[in-house]
Amino acid sequence: MKKGSKREAGGPQAEQPEPLFSGEDRSLSDGNIVDESDSEESQYSGLEDSGSDSTEDEEEHSSEEIQQNPGKSPKEIRKVPHRPSKSEANSAAAEEDKPSAAKEYENDSSDEEDIRNTVGNIPMEWYQDFPHIGYDLDGRKIFKPLRSKDQLEQFLDKMENPDYWRTVHDKKTGQDVRLTDEQVDLVERLQRGQFGDINYDPYQPSIDFFTHETMIHPVTNRPADKRSFIPSLIEKEKVSKLVHAIKMGWIQPRKPRDDSPAYYDLWAKEDPNAILGRHKMHVPAPKLPLPGHEQSYNPPPEYLMSEEERLAWEQQDPEDRKVPFLPQRFPCLRAVPGYARFIHERFERCLDLYLCPRQRKMRVNVDPEDLIPKLPKPRDLQPFPTVQSLIYRGHKDLVRCISVAPSGQWLVSGSDDCTVRFWEVGTGRCMKSVLLEGAVKSISWNPNPGLVLVAACVEHSVVLINPGLGDRLLCGATDQHIGGYQPPEEEGQQPVSWGEAEGTEYSNGLRLCIKHQKAVKQVTWHARGDYFAVVLPDNGNSQVLIHQLSRRRSQNPFRKNKGQVQKVLFHPTRPFFFVATQRCVRVYNLLKQELSKKLLTNCKWVSSIAVHPAGDNLICGSYDSKLAWFDMDLSTKPYKVLRHHKKALRAVSYHKQYPLFASGSDDGSVIVCHGMVYNDLLQNPLIVPVKVLRGHAIHRDLGVLDVIFHPTQPWVFSSGADATIRLYT
């Protein structure tokens, strides 16, 4: 019996079937549970819910027994167990089942009483694409009711059905539900913003439970909870998080509140001695133009209008007239009448003052030093020649031209003393001197390292000289190359005559002599050393001639020369030919036989030109002391014009390996500049003057006549009118 009572008192074990008792002994088992509820085992079993249930059952049975036996006390009834018969037990069980079934839904407050299916409170959107709306208790599908009404049937139903307006569709059952009057009334009240319950009075009189009178006893005498005087763990965690945030700098203290008034006086800090605020933006009116000569009472005759000009002035509109009045002449100032346009001009002036807007011209104050480009310091651009190292003496007259061998070991110079001298660069020793028939105007060493050959301009001839210096094999190969020429069977007519040197001239080093009809001014070699060009100072069509050494053939590349040719040059890598006239430099394409570019020098008289080893840049010197740098990829106008020299420029030159170029002038100085050309076409060349080299004496108003760089070292040679050649390293 105790085991059965304990199982029935337990919560989860009460649901299991009880084999010890049948349905007939239900009242007996209940009575035993009531009797055993006061035992020690039930008190210390730990099942609080079973104890409460047993006490409730005990009270129900005791009340029933008291009603049946009104003369006995509850203790006596509890002590005497009642063992009913089988028929009484069945009837009692039936009576207990009836009120239990009736009381099942008395206190049920569920909102799902009217649900006719068992799908549960789930979103019906889950089954919108299925033919069923859920499952019943047995796991079978609950199919949706058939809704085969089309729009016409729905419209007829709307017109004919009087309850259509109070019919709604239930999504959970899939059926149309007709709202009752109470439900319609509830909907209308909610639409009006009223409470759903009709009997609810929101304005019922309030009862002030706590009064102003101090009461002796508290309202509630409930003891304080244990958690009220135990530190809270949640607050501890919050405090630890706040401390960590403060340490990490995530929480900053509040900034001190600014108690300054929101409205303050704008002119509180105004200096009383300063200009008033309304005059700070004052724009003064433009002044009236001063009177001119035409407004004089005795103007010059050229300001007086003739009759034709007067008629034309009168026919013009007042807005188109250059002068708003007719100039007049009076014999004296006393004869001048009053000015008739005075009031009109004052009125127009007043209109201009208050109708015409004024604009303040913002003048930018720019520091002049900011306009100067920031150039690197010269010491950061080394190496470049800085000091005079050697002086080559031996010529008796001014040295007009110099040239350096491709190896850089030998130097050749031509002078007005009719000699060509060969010097050793390292020692300054004159290795050989060749006497010619006249003054040497130009000289050039063959750039081909396989040939030892020098071309010099003497009067009407160009002389080719083999100095016999350096490697004997190269000297012999040069003579063999010149002597191996075989004349063609039919010689065409040429503008010049080629002749070979013999006897004493051959022993002095002369090999060929090319005679021209006029004096030769300049000679220059092609980069391969087979072609060389000469310039004849003449206004005719044959100012420029190109000679070929291997075939001993000469030709005139131009039918007509525009302007007087000053200098010519070959492009170092491309088939271009530069021709410098007095004002411009023309670039010709020898393959296409056409003019490629025309560079405008903006100079009065071009004296010399030089081409950068890369071939994209060119410098041009002039007699008006200007040096123009041309970037041929950029423009046909000078990229930069340098005016460093005080007198005429005589020569300019590029270095073949270093970013250097130099210019020599009649002021006796040689200026060396750093000229860096970048491979990036978007970056302009960098030009920085680095050194001014002096040393030449001015003779007959002439200074430095020629400048040339050493082929491999950052050295520069200069020849001057003082009959000397100087080396700067």
Curated annotation (Swiss-Prot):
Family: Belongs to the WD repeat BOP1/ERB1 family.
Keywords for the protein's UniProt record, in alphabetical order: Nucleus, Repeat, Ribosome biogenesis, rRNA processing, WD repeat
Function comment: Component of the PeBoW complex, which is required for maturation of 28S and 5.8S ribosomal RNAs and formation of the 60S ribosome.
Name of the protein in its database record: Ribosome biogenesis protein bop1
InterPro entries according to UniProt: BOP1/Erb1, BOP1_N_dom, WD40/YVTN_repeat-like_dom_sf, WD40_repeat_CS, WD40_repeat_dom_sf, WD40_rpt
Biased composition (Basic and acidic residues): 95-106
Cited Gene3D superfamilies: YVTN repeat-like/Quinoprotein amine dehydrogenase
WD repeat windows: 394-433, 435-475, 515-557, 560-598, 601-640, 644-683, 699-729
Signal peptide (from-to): none
Region feature (Disordered): 1-115
Subunit description: Component of the PeBoW complex, composed of bop1, pes1 and wdr12. The complex is held together by bop1, which interacts with pes1 via its N-terminal domain and with wdr12 via a high-affinity interaction between the seven-bladed beta-propeller domains of the 2 proteins. The PeBoW complex associates with the 66S pre-ribosome.
Superkingdom, taxonomy of origin: Eukaryota
Record localization: Nucleus, Nucleolus; Nucleus, Nucleoplasm
Comp. bias regions, Acidic residues: 50-62
